[in-house]
Each structure stands twice: as C-alpha cells, then as structure tokens.
C-alpha cells in the first residue's frame, strides 16, 4: 500500500499547516520555539520578524464582532499576535496587503519584572485600535472588537516573544460572531456497484 502525505513538511509554525479552530476555547500546552519553514509574518506592529510562532485558522459562520483573549499560562510570558484575512489570497497571500491583508496585530508588552498577562481583541478589556505595539510604549494590550462577515477566513499567528514553553489559552467566548458551525458531519452518499 502506498500512501502519499500531501502535507509532508508542513508545520503548525507555518500558515499552511495551521491548527483549525473549531471551538470557543483552545488550550496550547506546548508553545514552540520553532518559526516553521516560511517567515510569513512581517506585520506592522511587530518590532521583529516572525519568531517562535504557531498559526491558527477559522472561518466565520455568522456575522458579528470578533473578540478573543490569548491568556498565557504563565503571566510573565509575552505573546504577540497578528490576524490576517486570508479569504481571497490564502496563506500564500500573506505579506501582500491586497490579497491577504493584516487586519489586526498587537505586540505590546511590559518590561520584566512586570507580568505581561493577556492580549488579544477585546473592547470590554479596554481594547482600542487595530495595531498596538511594539513594546511598552504603544498599548494597550488589547485591540478593539473586529467586525467580521460570514464566509471570511482568518489566519491568526501567535508569537512567543519570551520563548517560554508553558503555553496559553485562546478564548473566543466574547465574540458575537459565530466562528464554527455546530452541524455534525454527514456521511457522503455512495453507491455500490
């Protein structure tokens, strides 16, 4: 038996190998120090290139406001992030504003020994604007809620600035948009000859 894996070499540290999010809460227990094979992220608010990154994707099912909180398991850890609309250009279009524009990013962080804590998109946590950072001069740690439309697909990159391996949670519970459907998969029709 021959099996060809079309995803050979793809890693969750690259957009093409991203984890598909399909629930309100995702826990990443093993953050990475890997940057993948492709340096996709050169976002507006990040002071440096992509580093120690993990990629996630989701497709909006119902219009609304997108909100998420990235909460480090260790409050001293500093996570930066960028969000891309990949509906038209896919992962290949990242870095090309017309194809897969960056719609939000945050690289705000405090200097040790101050804890960095959570970041993300959350107006209810004081979020403003759509591009905050870099460093401790251009906050806050949260961006304003983002209007999203059914059918749009997004890629979220989370970068592990402190290079900790402790991980984080991503919580979409404040979103008014539905990001995943609750319809169980149905078996495809088939015929027996």
Placement of each model-derived feature along the sequence:
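Acidic, Ser/Thr/Pro-rich low-complexity intrinsically disordered segments
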Residues: 10-11, 17-27, 32-153, 158-167, ...
């Amino acid at each position: 038996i021959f099996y060809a894996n079309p995803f050979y070499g793809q890693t969750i540290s690259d957009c093409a190998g991203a984890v598909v999010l399909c629930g309100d809460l995702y826990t990443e227990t093993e953050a990475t120090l890997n940057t993948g094979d492709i340096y996709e992220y050169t976002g507006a608010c990040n002071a440096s290139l992509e580093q120690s990154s993990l990629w996630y994707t989701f497709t909006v099912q119902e219009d609304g406001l997108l909100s998420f909180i990235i909460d480090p398991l260790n409050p001293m850890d500093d996570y930066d992030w960028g969000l891309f609309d990949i509906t038209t250009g896919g992962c290949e279009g990242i870095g090309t504003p017309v194809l897969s524009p960056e719609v939000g990013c945050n690289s705000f962080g405090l200097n040790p020994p101050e804890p960095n804590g959570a970041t993300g998109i959350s107006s209810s946590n004081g979020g403003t604007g759509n591009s905050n950072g870099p460093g401790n001069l251009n906050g806050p740690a949260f961006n304003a809620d983002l209007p999203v439309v059914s059918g749009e697909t997004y890629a979220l990159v989370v970068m592990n600035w402190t290079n900790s391996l402790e991980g984080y949670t991503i919580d979409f519970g404040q979103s008014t948009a539905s990001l995943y459907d609750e319809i169980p998969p149905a078996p495809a029709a088939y015929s027996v000859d």
